[in-house]
């Protein structure tokens, strides 16, 4: 029986997880951040993993709660942090460790998948737009409010605005639609401006690897080549786990294709 890896992406609003047997994802799940009862229920009958790899960008309390849940298994959790170089990606952040572990894992996954310059976009609670060069250099990136947060900020600061039930329109004729459409345009504009900037650096138009809760809403509004990928962070955690495991054991690091395709 193949050893099992549990990968956990603990974000600001959701916890995503997947159990991998070295070839395929056997199970995947998602729970609202802080919903310990659901995670306990989903993990209660899970086959015991031999490794646990986690990206956590939530607070220390969340890390403590996850640690308590994971204590049911013998494997010591590996909490991922960004490093200067890993899996072919070079981190050019001025302070490499300051880069969020979720962004780092997503960059690793995108590089392993594409092996060329691309934009890596996670449209979650916040949206990140990160640039990869043709040689695997993380050049830098943007952070903006996400689709829901952008509208929430305006509603909270300008309390008379109504935001419920908004939808995207070419010419919005209600406040809710104007807020929603404005947020989509702002996010799409940030992505397209970064794509144009990166195209000038690379000499070719980069593909946009898009993930996150608002990916489906954004994709139709983008005038760039888009590839939507679910669970990009989990895929990056899988690649990182394989490299760190095989490097530690003195083995040959798994090929990029093997690390990402399943």
Swiss-Prot record:
It catalyses: (R)-pantothenate + ATP = (R)-4'-phosphopantothenate + ADP + H(+). Pathway: Cofactor biosynthesis; coenzyme A biosynthesis; CoA from (R)-pantothenate: step 1/5. It is an enzyme of class 2 (transferase). Signal peptide: none annotated. Transmembrane segments: none annotated. Its EC number is 2.7.1.33. Substrate binds at residues 93, 100-103, 175. Belongs to the type III pantothenate kinase family. Homodimer. This is Type III pantothenate kinase. It comes from Nitrosospira multiformis (strain ATCC 25196 / NCIMB 11849 / C 71). The gene is coaX.
């Amino acid at each position: 029986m193949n050893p099992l890896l549990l990968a956990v992406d603990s974000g600001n609003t959701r916890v995503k997880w997947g159990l991998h047997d070295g070839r395929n994802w056997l199970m995947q799940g998602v729970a609202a951040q802080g919903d310990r009862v659901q995670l306990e229920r989903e993990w209660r009958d899970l086959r015991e993993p031999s490794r646990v790899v986690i990206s956590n960008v939530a607070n220390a309390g969340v890390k403590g709660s996850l640690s308590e849940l994971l204590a049911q298994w013998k494997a010591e959790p590996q909490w991922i942090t960004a490093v200067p170089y890993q899996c072919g990606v070079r981190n050019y952040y001025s302070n490499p460790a300051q880069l969020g572990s979720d962004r780092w894992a997503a960059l690793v996954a995108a590089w392993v998948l594409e092996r060329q310059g691309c934009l890596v976009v996670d449209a979650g609670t916040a949206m990140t737009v990160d640039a990869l060069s043709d040689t695997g250099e993380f050049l830098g990136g943007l952070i903006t409010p996400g689709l829901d947060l952008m509208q929430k900020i305006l509603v909270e600061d300008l309390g008379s605005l109504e935001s419920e039930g908004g939808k995207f329109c070419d010419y919005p004729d209600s406040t809710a639609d104007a807020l929603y459409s404005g947020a989509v345009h702002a996010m799409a504009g940030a992505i397209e401006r970064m794509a144009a900037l990166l195209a000038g650096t690379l000499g070719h138009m980069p593909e946009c690897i898009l993930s996150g809760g608002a990916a489906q809403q954004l994709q139709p509004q983008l005038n760039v080549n888009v590839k939507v990928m679910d669970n990009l962070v989990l895929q990056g955690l899988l690649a990182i786990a394989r490299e760190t495991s095989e490097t530690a054991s003195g083995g040959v690091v798994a090929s990029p294709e093997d690390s990402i395709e399943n």
